[in-house]
């Protein structure tokens, strides 16, 4: 159960990052003032996702050792890289993909799955 909650923290955190990027993209398409930026639905959704992720993270820290939980957050790097490619069509280098592979192997080792 805790591993599933940890995965949810990763998804909320990465979702929040993707929403922040989308907020910036929307501001570039249609310039607006600071007040309008703060009221952006994308920005509000990102704050909600990141806030929920933080609350769930605090809950998990009561149940899991930090030495096990924190390294598992490296999955965030993988998810953000894949999300940036899928949603924002960013170019990802060969070295980045090799790094993703290393991160996945490391997370599996830390989680005792390899």
Swiss-Prot record:
SUPFAM superfamilies, per the entry: Multidrug resistance efflux transporter EmrE
Sorted UniProt keywords: Cell inner membrane, Cell membrane, Lipid A biosynthesis, Lipid biosynthesis, Lipid metabolism, Lipopolysaccharide biosynthesis, Membrane, Transmembrane, Transmembrane helix, Transport
InterPro entries assigned to the protein according to its UniProt record, in alphabetical order: EamA_dom (IPR000620), Flippase_ArnE (IPR022883), Small_drug/metabolite_transptr (IPR000390)
Protein localization: Cell inner membrane
Membrane protein topology class: Multi-pass membrane protein
GO function terms (MF aspect): carbohydrate derivative transmembrane transporter activity
Pathways per UniProt: Bacterial outer membrane biogenesis; lipopolysaccharide biosynthesis
Main subcellular location: membrane
Gene Ontology cellular component list: plasma membrane
GO biological process: lipid A biosynthetic process; lipopolysaccharide biosynthetic process
TM ranges: 41-61, 64-84, 94-114
Domain EamA: 43-112
Domain of life: Bacteria
Function field: Translocates 4-amino-4-deoxy-L-arabinose-phosphoundecaprenol (alpha-L-Ara4N-phosphoundecaprenol) from the cytoplasmic to the periplasmic side of the inner membrane.
PANTHER family referenced in this protein's UniProt entry, alphabetically: 4-AMINO-4-DEOXY-L-ARABINOSE-PHOSPHOUNDECAPRENOL FLIPPASE SUBUNIT ARNE-RELATED, SMR FAMILY PROTON-DEPENDENT DRUG EFFLUX TRANSPORTER SUGE
Family: Belongs to the ArnE family.
Subunit structure: Heterodimer of ArnE and ArnF.
This protein's name: Probable 4-amino-4-deoxy-L-arabinose-phosphoundecaprenol flippase subunit ArnE
Gene: arnE
């Amino acid at each position: 159960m805790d591993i599933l909650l940890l995965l949810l923290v990763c998804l909320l955190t990465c979702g929040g990052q993707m929403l922040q990027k989308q907020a910036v993209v929307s501001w570039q398409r249609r310039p607006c003032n600071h007040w309008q930026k703060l009221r952006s639905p994308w920005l509000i959704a990102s704050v909600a996702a990141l806030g929920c992720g933080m609350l769930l993270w605090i809950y998990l820290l009561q149940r899991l050792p930090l030495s096990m939980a924190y390294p598992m957050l490296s999955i965030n790097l993988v998810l953000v890289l894949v999300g940036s490619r899928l949603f924002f069509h960013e170019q990802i280098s060969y070295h980045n993909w090799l790094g993703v592979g290393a991160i996945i192997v490391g997370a599996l080792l830390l989680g005792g799955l390899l």
